[in-house]
Amino acid sequence: MSETNWEEPSELIIEQIEIGPMQNFTYIVGSRSTREVAIVDPAWDIDALLEHIDEKDYNVTGALITHYHPDHCGGAMGGHSVAGVAELMGQRPVRVYAHKAEAAGVVKVTGISDSDIVKVDSGDTLSIGDVEVQFLHTPGHTPGSQCFRIKNTLVSGDTLFIDGCGRVDLPGSDTEDMYH
């Protein structure tokens, strides 16, 4: 697990953590003054993520899911079981935020209950302490893929990369949606 931490004298906590054999990025976002945080795409090593959060004296209250693929939220993948939101919820009482078009996929791959998911739509907001997260529906990689705008930062999951965009050759993906 490797960490990139952008230190800035602001209210925003944002930490990028590379995790898992696919070198996914998980983010810890939240409020510096309240120490309240959410984990974006909690998958692979939930114990290490929670240990890191505890070391920083953060209080994790939510999980923000960009899309339902197991490498981003946990579940069965290629004959392996990836730890994710189900394991996180087993250790901490968090709320799971997924786009309304993605909720059924999150339930299917993770095994959590539909009632465990807060279904959001594009433009909805969430306050994490004194920091506001705006949900942005960005279909293409999956029908309910979403990004998160936090102050002047975009957390994009598998929608956007430095050198391209997420795959559009997977079941449920749509090239036209990705490029609009």
What name fits each language-model region?
Residues 1-9, 13, 173-180:
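Accessory terminal helices/loops
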Residues 4-58, 147-157, 162:
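Conserved beta-strand hairpin/beta-sheet module of binuclear metal-dependent hydrolase folds
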Residues 7-14, 105, 130-133:
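Short Pro/Gly-enriched beta-strand edge/turn motifs at strand-loop
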Residues 17-18, 117, 137-139:
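Short Gly/Pro-enriched turn/cap motifs at secondary-structure boundaries
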Residues 26-28, 49, 75, 79-80, ...:
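Short, function-defining helix-loop hinge/capping sites that tune catalysis or transport
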Residues 34, 45-132:
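Active-site HxH/HxHxD metal-binding segment of metal-dependent hydrolases
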Residues 40, 66, 98, 136, ...:
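Active-site flanking residues adjacent to catalytic metal/cofactor-binding acidic residues
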Residues 125, 132-137, 142-180:
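Metallo-beta-lactamase
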